[in-house]
Amino acid sequence: MILAGGRSLRMGRDKAWLESEAQPLLLRQLGILEQAGLRSIAVAAGPENRPPLPPTPAGIPLLRDRFADLGPMAGVEAGLGWAHPRFPNGWTLLVAVDLPELSVEWLQQLIARIAPGKGCVPIYQGRLEPLAAIYPNLAWTIAQEHLEKQKASVQAFCRRGLETGWMSLWELSDQDHRALTNWNTPLDWPVAQAQRGP
């Protein structure tokens, strides 16, 4: 699942539309997931009033937040809620839309670290990376519980999984962490930098 429902306030424009490799980031991420062998792909598209996303291929569902104004955690819940009835004992691989360095090889390393009933979250220098992680679909009810209590931290959701055994850690090397370089402001976006000139 691709998390693409954010408001991109720091960027000043919708990150799903930013171009990488001559295509919007959203379509790039779809291609990476398909190349990694994933067949059931959805996009967490945020609230109903979110501006339009780049057109996606037919059959890619756009999932809407069921909990208002609770950030990425609402997208995590939407994805798990979509996947759980289809694959109750499976997993949901979640990636943020604004990870232009993400690769098939990196995703395959992540996928290799899951186990029955247990997902995997990368960690780098002590900080979890929950927006490029795999969650067991059985955690859907826990995601609902967090949001019903207005707990919007995906970090806290992951920590609960680590404490109770349904998540594991992948300690990233410096090289592996480069795949999680993201674009948060115009200064992070190479095209924007080129337009600014030297």
Where are the regions that the model predicts?
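Nucleotide and nucleotide-moiety/phosphate-recognizing core
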Residues: 1-179, 187-197
